[in-house]
Amino acid sequence: MTLLPQILLVTGAVAWGLGWLPLHHFASVGLVGMPLVLLVYGLLSLFAIPVLWFERRAWMPQRNGLLAIAVCGGGATAALVTALAIGEVVRVMLLFYLAPVWGVLGGWLLLGERLTPLRIGALLLAMLGIALTLNISSALTHPLSGSDWLALAAGLGFSLNNLATRAADQVPLASKTLAPFLGSALIAVVLCPVLGE
């Protein structure tokens, strides 16, 4: 029996859990928001573009699905990276992890999936959990911060990305995986001058 799956799972969880550390380091030296997204995902796009070009014949019939993956996944990544760099990490991650709520609702509204009593119960428990964790009574008297809104947008974008990924079933896995990198870089290219960064 091989331990490779367990090692990969633990390694991925550790990398995901500690991914905010370099973001805070970059923020401490003044590289934050869309310029950071442009730098990181611009570099990753250098690897993504050749793969996307090589697989273009396979994804061309579902190019709109791949575009949705790039926009939704790229937007989610850009929003999450910025929120983690400027906000409270725990709060940002809690708001981001409402993504399954948006995913269930999106599956119901966009893909016609059934909302079973079990799913409705899970949605209600998730909303109650976030309300208790974030102290909803104070949230009603204090508006959400910019990083809070970015975290919510990231969760919503991630859910829409997952729905688009499921719908674009003929797009090769490598293209589905790499398109959000290019999407993040392009979103940052547009938003850097708009935001004056």
Regions found by a protein language model. Name each.
Residues L18, E55-R91, L132:
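Specific transmembrane alpha-helical segments of multi-pass solute transporters/efflux pumps
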Residues A48, L118-S137, A154:
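Hydrophobic transmembrane alpha-helices of multi-pass small-molecule transport proteins
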Residues S28-P35, A79-L95, V171-S175:
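Structural motif at transmembrane-helix junctions in multi-pass transporters
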Residues M1-V14, S28, L43-A68, L115-I120, ...:
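Membrane-interface interhelical linkers
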Residues V14-G17, L21, I49, A70-A78, ...:
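Hydrophobic/small/kink-forming positions within alpha-helical transmembrane segments
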Residues L52-E55, T82, A99-G121:
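C-terminal transmembrane-helix exit sites in multi-pass transporters
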Residues W20-G33, A85-E88, L134-G146, C192-E197:
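Membrane-interface helix termini and inter-helical loops of multi-pass transporters
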Residues L43, F47, L95-L109, G183-I187:
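Alpha-helical transmembrane segments of compact multi-pass small-molecule transporters, enriched
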